[in-house]
């Protein structure tokens, strides 16, 4: 099974197979291969916080690994050698969910929309799943970090606690030692004086010190004292040193206390900080991402299920409406919720990464703190070891020896006494043994001689039998006499104790000497065994010792044995007296219960008459005549007495037998009791012995357990010390390596300085070369500055690119905001959609404003940074130009010097040539033998020296010229490179100026657009003294501002294009730095200033107002929806007369044109709705039809088609009529509608009779008059009973217009009413009303007495070929139609609805 290896600083979890790893180096190598930690920097711990051991590598399940580089202490805030933080991911960019549809009436378009949304939701779910996994990994890394940190703190705690225990032990020892040392320092002279005043035996002094204190001829020169046992010089020396050593010791103890206090304080602070880190842990949020992912997957699954559901839909209108509702639910709830939860998941991921980075930094700081505490712990341990191993404390040992001299003398004296007594006992016992063996030998010899005499002289046996005197004997010799110790006695030791008491020595010394004297009387081990031989109720032979020697002649032992014997005899007598008292008590109890002899065999009833009879015979004197009778009675009495005596004798024998039996039983009982007492006593002794052994075993076991724990603790401490020693060695090795590197660097620097000094010591050429080298270094520094400038330019370009991207993002956001608020495609008809749209737009506006605020601040900071960098570059450019000018001047001087040197060289060459010519001439003259040879030779030598000098000068000048030419060439190359770099920098500066100009223009345009946005939202913006003020415009003034919007925009554009503003926009084109700064400040205070905080607050308040309005509208919409549902429910059974659509209930009546079978829907203002005839309608037998519309087709009459096509279309039936756009012979260009309808309640009678009804809830009474009746209006019905014309007459007139007038009117097109259009989605058929015709019981009810507003009778009619024909009953005179509303309201209002 692989071992889990946790990396502390990164939270990484590795799985390493440790089955083949046997050493720590192999484990470190395996970890180093899997991580970036060097092998020598790996520290391994196991979960209890202990160091990893080689023998436990294969058995550990988890191992914590730390990087020792993280423990290297540095300055606060200094960077760590390892990168701890991980970069935050880019913000998760979510595309808007698909919301575009091509055709709302096409099912395929809806399915495509659902498919795109499903793909979008699936992709979003996968992204969220990845983010959730990454967040889970971060939380797991934090858990691993906390586990490693816990193990490190536990390890530190074990080390610190062990050090604390050592410190406590040392503190206890030091407390007593300090007191003892103080006493020794203050009383050593007093102790020495005491020793001087106490006499001792000179022989003991000789034995203990080897010095002879006696004088010549064996006479003592002085009395030996305890002072002779002490080296006085050494004592005085140590006594003088003792105060200094004591001060040092106290100072070390104080330093140790301070160090230990700092150690414990730092450790407690570290432990408290660790507890705070644990309490602040974010691990409680580790499951939030998982729960959020489950919600996201549930929503994505809902979108998936809805997509599959829509794939099963047909092309029916009902399915289209259902698909539209599902899409609307997605748009309002599911997709925004997915979008919001995805952003929450991204936020959770970023939160987890930030928490992980913060924990990594805290963990690294903890490791540094742990390293500091460990170093302090090592300091405390070193102080403890230094105190414990201090060699100067030997001073106090010698002073303590002075204090303990009486005890040492008493100990040696007691030892001498023991040895003398032991030797005397050995001699006595050996002599006694030899004497006893001699007696045994003599007795054996006598027995043999006597035996030989008894058997007589026989021939049996060996020949030497008669003279056999060789009896085995025993010879005792003492070997190896002990060294000669002085002869002392107990009396001498007791006198020494008395002397100490008189001298008022230390009480502890007196007590120790008294203990020594008392221990002299203690028996030996064998003697103690004999004394304790009686154990557990019996005497054990093994407890008597191996021999009977070494106890004879011991008076003390005999006295102790006699005391034990006396005690045992006393116990025996006490037990015997107790037994006698018990026997006496038992005997008395037996006598009290025994019967008397007189009444032994008689009952009391028998004894009383006899006694009374005898009394009467004795007391009453009988007559003489009665003597015979009395004699007979007397004989009987004699016989009776004899018989009673005989029975008495038998009873005595029987009683004696019973007494003997009782005595035997009593004896037996006593024996049994005695045995029971012995058994109980034995048992008691055994139990006590076992209890004693148990207590001894428990004490011994506790002692052994304590010793085992101490040994284990010492073992762990030793291992920790070994581990710390290894770490300290590694740290020391690292520090030594650093010191070696530092020394090497210093050595190299010294070597370089030495070489520089040697180079400086050269001549002029070397000096010029050094100058050239310095100039070259300056050029290299300039090149480095240019390279740094290029790097800064690259960074600035990156920042500029980032700024441009941010500006583009802001521009796009502003355009979208402008499009959303100003150029909207249209206002939604539903109030819910309107409220949701306003809320969404407001939320998006606020979010974009906040992003824009951050981007503007970043852009401003980047702009300021770019300005600073541009200034620095200009300064660097000026410095570079100055350096180039200086270099050109230097090069010109060098050229001049080079020319001068060349001229000098030419002159020297000319002089050299002249000298050579003169030399040649002189040589020729000498050769010719001219006079004056000596002067010529002198001249020749001078000329030769001059030539040599000129030659040397020429060589030096040539070398100088060569070096100068080389330097000139290098300067020219440097100059060319600097000029090219200067050109590049100039181009980049110009490019940066252009980009800065672009940024300024964009900043200005963005500020202007934000101002326009505020004005669009109904606010006015004003600036005074650099402060922007936003005020809300009253609603009354907004209309005038909207009317003047275009003119205001033109004015603003003109104002923005003023020369002053243009000049401020191009502030970077200023000629000098001061002018540029002034223009920039003016630009930032006027055009570039925009209070984003005020803008955000204004938009926020506006959003809150919109939310308040939206909530109010939602409450209104909720009420309207309830009313709509109620109206829809109420209108479901009412007949519609306008806005015909699918699901409405319509009344169809036959038109005048009966040839084509045209049936039209009864309507007001909505003509040309014709019924498609079906077989089940049975229209031939009907006068009217109430049916529910299932389909409405819009058609336009086109008479331009051929006649053949028209006839073929008219000749078809059913589906062929769908292609004929004029089946009812309508006018050309007329828009009409073909309706498919199903009868609402099939089975109604085709021709209802009088008093009958076709609809259960409708009562109709009609009377027709076939005679010609005058009409009040053309095309209308006569009003019966002389009633006044009602408001329906006007409707009848308008419906009876000619075809041409209707075609020219606007009523032939379908235009939705405003109110109906607003509620058409949620309340279909809301404007339909019920049409109910109530039959009257009398003909004159409705004609003669109209009841209020319900009495008027309308004349129902419609346009050309669609005049209404009421179904008439067979009454010949007239027909009368009365329409009433069951609810009691106006009949015409219920029929027509709100107008």
UniProtKB/Swiss-Prot annotation:
Composition-biased stretches (Polar residues): 590-619
MF (Gene Ontology): molecular adaptor activity; protein kinase binding
Gene Ontology biological-process annotations: autophagosome assembly; autophagy of mitochondrion; piecemeal microautophagy of the nucleus; protein transport; reticulophagy; ribophagy
A matching Pfam family: ATG11
Membrane-topology annotation of the record: Peripheral membrane protein
Keyword Repeat in record: no
Compositionally biased region (Low complexity): 1292-1311, 1337-1350
Keyword Magnesium: no
Protein family membership: Belongs to the ATG11 family.
Protein function: Involved in cytoplasm to vacuole transport (Cvt), pexophagy, mitophagy and nucleophagy. Recruits mitochondria for their selective degradation via autophagy (mitophagy) during starvation. Works as scaffold proteins that recruit ATG proteins to the pre-autophagosome (PAS), the site of vesicle/autophagosome formation. Required for the Cvt vesicles completion.
Protein name: Autophagy-related protein 11
Native organism: Pyricularia oryzae (strain 70-15 / ATCC MYA-4617 / FGSC 8958)
Gene assigned in the entry: ATG11
């Amino acid at each position: 099974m692989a071992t889990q290896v946790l990396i502390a600083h990164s939270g990484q979890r590795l799985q390493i197979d440790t089955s083949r790893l046997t050493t720590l180096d192999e484990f470190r190598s395996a970890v180093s291969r899997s991580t970036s930690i060097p092998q020598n920097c790996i520290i391994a711990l196991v979960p209890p916080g202990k160091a990893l051991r080689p023998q436990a590598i294969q058995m550990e399940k988890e191992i914590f690994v730390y990087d020792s580089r993280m423990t290297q202490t540095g300055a606060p805030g200094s960077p760590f050698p390892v990168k701890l933080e991980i970069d935050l991911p880019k913000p998760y960019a979510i595309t808007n969910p698909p919301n575009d549809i091509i055709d709302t009436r096409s099912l395929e378009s809806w399915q495509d929309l659902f498919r795109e949304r499903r793909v979008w939701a699936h992709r979003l779910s996968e992204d969220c799943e990845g983010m959730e996994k990454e967040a889970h990994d971060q939380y797991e890394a934090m858990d691993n970090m906390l586990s490693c940190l816990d193990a490190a703190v536990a390890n530190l705690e074990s080390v610190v606690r062990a050090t604390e225990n050592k410190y406590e032990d040392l503190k206890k020892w030091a407390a007593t030692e300090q007191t003892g040392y103080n006493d020794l320092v203050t009383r050593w002279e007093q102790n020495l004086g005491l020793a001087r005043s106490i006499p001792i035996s000179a022989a003991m002094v000789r034995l203990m010190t080897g010095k002879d204190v006696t004088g010549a001829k064996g006479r003592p020169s002085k009395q030996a004292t305890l002072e002779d046992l002490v080296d006085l010089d050494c004592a005085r020396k140590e006594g003088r040193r003792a105060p200094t050593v004591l001060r040092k010791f106290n100072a070390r103890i104080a330093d140790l206390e301070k160090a230990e206090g700092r150690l414990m304080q730092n450790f407690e602070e570290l432990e408290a900080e660790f507890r705070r880190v644990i309490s602040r842990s974010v691990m409680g949020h580790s499951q939030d991402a998982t729960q959020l992912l489950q919600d996201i997957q549930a929503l994505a699954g809902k979108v998936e299920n809805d997509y599959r559901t829509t794939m099963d839909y047909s092309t029916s209108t009902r399915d289209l409406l259902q698909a539209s509702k599902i899409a609307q639910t997605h748009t309002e709830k599911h997709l925004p919720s997915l979008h919001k939860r995805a952003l929450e998941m991204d936020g959770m991921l970023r939160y987890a990464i930030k928490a992980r980075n913060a924990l990594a930094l805290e963990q690294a700081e903890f490791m540094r703190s742990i390293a500091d505490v460990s170093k302090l712990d090592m300091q405390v341990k070193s102080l403890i070891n230094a105190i414990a191993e201090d060699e100067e404390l030997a001073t106090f040992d010698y002073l303590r020896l002075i204090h303990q001299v009486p005890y040492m003398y008493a100990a040696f004296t007691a030892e001498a006494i023991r040895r003398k007594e032991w030797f005397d006992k050995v001699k006595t016992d050996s002599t006694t043994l030899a004497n006893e063996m001699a007696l045994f030998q003599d007795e054996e010899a006598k027995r043999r001689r006597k035996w030989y005499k008894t058997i007589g002289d026989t021939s049996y046996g060996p020949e030497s039998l008669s003279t056999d005197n060789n009896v085995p004997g025993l010879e005792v010799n003492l070997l190896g006499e002990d060294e000669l110790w002085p002869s002392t006695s107990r009396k001498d030791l007791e006198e020494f104790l008395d002397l100490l008491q008189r001298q008022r020595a230390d009480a502890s010394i007196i007590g120790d000497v008294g203990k020594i004297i008392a221990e002299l009387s203690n028996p030996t081990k064998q003697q103690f065994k004999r004394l304790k031989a009686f154990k557990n109720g019996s005497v054990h032979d093994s407890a008597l010792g191996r021999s009977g020697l070494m106890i004879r002649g011991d008076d003390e032992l005999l006295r102790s044995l006699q005391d034990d014997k006396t005690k045992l005899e006393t116990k025996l007598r006490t037990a015997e007296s107790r037994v006698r008292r018990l026997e006496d008590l038992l005997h008395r109890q037996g006598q009290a219960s025994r019967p008397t002899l007189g009444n032994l065999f008689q009952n009391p009833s028998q004894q009383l008459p006899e006694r009374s009879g005898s009394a009467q015979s004795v007391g009453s004197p009988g007559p003489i005549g009665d003597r015979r009778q009395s004699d007979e009675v007397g004989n009987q009495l004699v016989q009776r007495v004899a018989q009673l005596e005989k029975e008495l004798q038998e009873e005595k024998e029987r009683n004696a037998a019973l007494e003997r039996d009782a005595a035997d039983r009593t004896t037996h009982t006593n024996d049994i009791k005695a045995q029971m007492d012995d058994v109980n006593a034995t048992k008691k002794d055994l139990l006590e012995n076992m209890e004693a052994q148990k207590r001894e075993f428990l004490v011994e076991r506790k002692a052994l357990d304590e010793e085992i724990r101490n040994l284990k603790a010492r073992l762990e401490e030793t291992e920790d010390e070994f581990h710390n020693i290894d770490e300290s060695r590694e740290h020391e090795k690292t520090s030594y390596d650093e010191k070696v590197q530092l020394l090497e660097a210093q050595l190299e620097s010294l070597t370089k300085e030495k070489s520089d000094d040697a180079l400086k010591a050269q001549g002029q050429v070397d000096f010029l070369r050094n100058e050239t080298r310095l100039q070259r270094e300056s050029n290299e520094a300039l090149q480095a500055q240019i390279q740094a400038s290029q790097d800064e330019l690259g960074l600035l370009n990156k920042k500029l690119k980032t700024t441009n991207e941010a500006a583009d993002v802001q521009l796009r956001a502003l355009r979208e905001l402008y499009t959303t608020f100003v150029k909207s495609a249209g206002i939604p008809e539903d109030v819910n959609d309107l409220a949701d749209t306003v809320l969404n737009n407001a939320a998006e506006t606020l979010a974009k404003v906040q992003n824009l605020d951050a981007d503007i601040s970043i852009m401003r900071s980047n702009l300021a940074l770019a300005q600073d960098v541009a200034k620095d570059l200009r300064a660097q450019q000026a410095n570079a130009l100055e350096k180039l000018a200086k270099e050109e001047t230097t090069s010109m001087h060098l050229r001049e010097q080079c020319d001068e040197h060349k001229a000098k060289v030419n002159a020297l060459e000319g002089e050299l040539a002249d000298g050579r010519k003169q030399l040649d001439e002189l040589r020729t003259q000498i050769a010719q033998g001219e006079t004056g040879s000596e002067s010529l030779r002198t001249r020749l030598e001078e000329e030769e020296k001059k030539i040599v000098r000129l030659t040397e000068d020429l060589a030096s000048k040539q070398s100088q010229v060569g070096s100068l030419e080389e330097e000139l060439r290098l300067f020219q190359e440097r100059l060319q490179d600097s000029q090219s770099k200067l050109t590049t920098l100039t181009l980049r500066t110009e490019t940066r100026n252009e980009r800065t100009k672009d940024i300024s223009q964009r900043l200005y345009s963005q500020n202007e657009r934000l101002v326009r946005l505020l004005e669009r939202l109904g606010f006015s913006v004003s600036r005074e003294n650099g402060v922007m003020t936003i005020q809300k415009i009253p609603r009354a003034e907004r209309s005038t501002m909207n009317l003047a919007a275009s003119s205001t925009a033109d004015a603003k554009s003109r104002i923005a294009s003023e020369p002053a503003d243009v000049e401020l926009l191009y502030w970077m084109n200023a000629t000098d730095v001061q002018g540029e700064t002034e223009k920039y400040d003016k630009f930032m205070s006027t055009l570039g200033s925009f209070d984003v905080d005020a803008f955000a607050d204004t938009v926020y308040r506006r959003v809150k107002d919109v939310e308040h309005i939206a909530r109010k509208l939602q409450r209104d919409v909720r009420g309207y929806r309830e009313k709509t549902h109620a109206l829809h429910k109420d209108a479901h059974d009412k007949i519609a007369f306008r806005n015909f659509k699918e699901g409405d209930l319509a009344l169809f009546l036959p038109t005048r044109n009966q040839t084509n079978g045209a049936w039209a829907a009864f309507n007001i203002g909505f003509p040309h709705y014709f019924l498609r005839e079906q077989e089940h309608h049975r229209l031939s037998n009907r006068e009217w039809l109430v049916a529910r519309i299932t389909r409405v087709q819009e058609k336009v009459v086109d008479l331009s088609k051929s006649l053949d096509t028209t006839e073929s279309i008219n000749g078809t039936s059913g589906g062929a009529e769908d292609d004929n756009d004029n089946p009812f012979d309508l006018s050309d260009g007329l828009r009409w509608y073909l309706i498919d309808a199903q009868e609402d309640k099939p089975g109604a009678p085709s021709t209802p009779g009088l008093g009958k009804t076709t609809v259960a809830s409708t009562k109709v009474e009609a009377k027709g008059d076939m005679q010609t009746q005058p009409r009040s209006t053309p095309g209308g019905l006569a009003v019966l009973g002389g009633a006044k014309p009602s408001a329906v007459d006007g409707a009848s007139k308008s419906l009876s217009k000619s075809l041409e007038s209707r075609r020219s009117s606007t009523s032939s097109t379908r235009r939705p009413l405003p109110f109906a259009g607003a509620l058409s989605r949620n309340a279909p058929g809301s404007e339909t009303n019920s049409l109910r015709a109530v039959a009257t019981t009398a003909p004159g009810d409705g004609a003669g007495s109209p009841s209020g507003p319900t009495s008027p009778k309308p004349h129902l009619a419609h346009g050309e070929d669609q005049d209404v024909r009421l179904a008439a009953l067979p009454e010949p005179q007239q027909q009368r139609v009365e329409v009433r509303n069951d609810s009691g309201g106006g009949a015409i209002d219920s029929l027509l609805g709100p107008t």
